[in-house]
């Protein structure tokens, strides 16, 4: 691992963070690991998928991750299907809990503070794009299909269209 990334272990929740994002003011971000959650068995420990486990366990895992990352707001999620679809989310998506897109998408853009953009990856690439001047960000799930379709470029275009 390079000096650009570092592990953080807050209250037993181990996350990976990016120094560059910290330095440009995007301090509340993280890449999760499995360490620090309440899930057991094949899901252990920090399962964040509502489709595979009791809701109360998943909510507790999110609470722990958010606390470790210093985040206290709303989270947005989608059903990822290896597309090039990037959704814009804003203050209307602040539910005080979780907002799930009503259609498939593999990325989000926003300039709204207090929104956690959640993507899931296994063997795909998580992409975070940050614009420190506009205080806007994109979070992208880029698998081989999405990469071939140009999802990262779609996220950059959406950032430029929405925020200049």
Model regions: which residues?
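Active-site microenvironment for binding and transforming phosphate-containing groups
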Residues: 1-164
């Amino acid at each position: 691992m390079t000096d650009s990334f570092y592990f953080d272990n807050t209250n037993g929740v181990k996350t990976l963070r990016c120094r560059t994002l910290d330095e440009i003011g995007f301090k509340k971000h993280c890449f999760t690991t499995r360490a620090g959650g309440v899930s057991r068995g094949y899901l252990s420990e920090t399962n964040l998928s509502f489709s595979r486990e009791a809701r109360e366990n998943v909510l507790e895992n999110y609470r722990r991750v958010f606390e470790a990352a210093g985040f206290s707001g709303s989270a947005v999620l989608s059903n990822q299907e290896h597309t090039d679809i990037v959704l814009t989310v804003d203050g209307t998506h602040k539910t005080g809990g979780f907002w799930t897109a009503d259609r498939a998408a593999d990325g989000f853009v926003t300039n709204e503070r207090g929104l956690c953009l959640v993507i899931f990856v296994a063997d795909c690439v998580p992409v975070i794009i940050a614009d420190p001047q506009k205080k806007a960000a994109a979070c992208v799930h880029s698998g081989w299909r999405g990469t071939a379709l140009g999802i990262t470029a779609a996220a950059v275009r959406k950032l430029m269209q929405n925020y200049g």
